[in-house]
């Protein structure tokens, strides 16, 4: 499917929306990447607790891949763009912030939606353009 766009990103109250402003797809320039937060949701869009925090060069392709192999809906809770090396380090920072919820690999488990949103806000505080 060419031209697939990400669904709108959910924002917690007070989260700086500037990095996401008018984001509709990937940055095609070489040397750039994304850190993302995807949440597994019920068919009604309610987060089920499982959250994937990772790095990719193509956030739209990664979203489609995760959605394809996952039987539940996937919602984007956050994505940050930057230079590849910086974003790879930022992914480690994001994993450290969420370490108390670590399940395995890049997957984390949260007990409620507000814990997901709080973690996204904490990750956002460490994002430097």
Enumerate the language-model features and the residues they cover:
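Non-catalytic accessory segments flanking enzymatic or RNA/DNA-binding domains
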Residues: 1-129
